Swiss-Prot record:
It comes from Equine herpesvirus 4 (strain 1942). Belongs to the herpesviridae UL21 family. The lineage of its organism: Viruses, Duplodnaviria, Heunggongvirae, Peploviricota, Herviviricetes. This is Protein UL21 homolog.
């Protein structure tokens, strides 16, 4: 369904960034188990 894909592509960058950061943090926690403090904005 093209409309669904375009809806995801048009998602605001802030929400995309939030999902991406969440993914990176979860991967890092699973890999190293290091306590992570989010200092980057």
């Amino acid at each position: 369904n093209v409309s669904l894909i375009t809806a995801f592509d048009n998602l605001d960058l802030s929400r995309k960034g939030a999902y991406y950061l969440y993914y990176l943090l979860s991967e890092r926690l699973k890999r190293g188990g290091v306590p992570v403090h989010v200092n980057r904005a």
